[in-house]
Amino acid sequence: RSTLFPYTTLFRSMGMVSYQTAWLKYYFPVEYMAALMTSVIDNPSKVSEYIYACRQMNIKILPPDINKGEANFSVDGRDIRYGLAAIKSIGRPVIKAIVEDREELGLFQNMEDFITRLSAKNILNKRTIENLIKAGALDTLGGTRKQFMSIYVQIVDHVTQEKKNSIVGQ
């Protein structure tokens, strides 16, 4: 019996996987890179490497967006939308709540709408909002990051107070 059989099978399999990977990267580069970045979403240095590779391939990386983004990196036309799960200190439950709320009630109209809708689920805190602002995930809500950073605390306090008033008023 030959001991070479298992090795030739292994090498053949590895060759096939390499061929399939190269084929996907060539014919579906945007989808391939989005999937590749999603596979290392918890490793910021690897994500940075792949973002650099995307730039070399002329693939644009769009910023994270609470109105368009998903938890993972996603394809947006011929571009890649940055995954919400790649933002530091944003937990999966928060991302799930954002996506589900958006799918159920439509796009978030402004910062107050966003905070009000997610505060009802008791899943949002000030640090999470701050990290979303810093990452640019709220940029499409009609304001600058500087403006958002200066008003989000007042909005959270206002929404919290309204919540307390509605409980007392019942």
Please give the residue ranges for each predicted region.
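Single conserved hydrophobic/aromatic residue that forms the stacking wall/gate
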Residues: 1-9
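Noncatalytic, beta-rich nucleic-acid-contacting surfaces in large DNA/RNA-processing enzymes
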Residues: 8-170
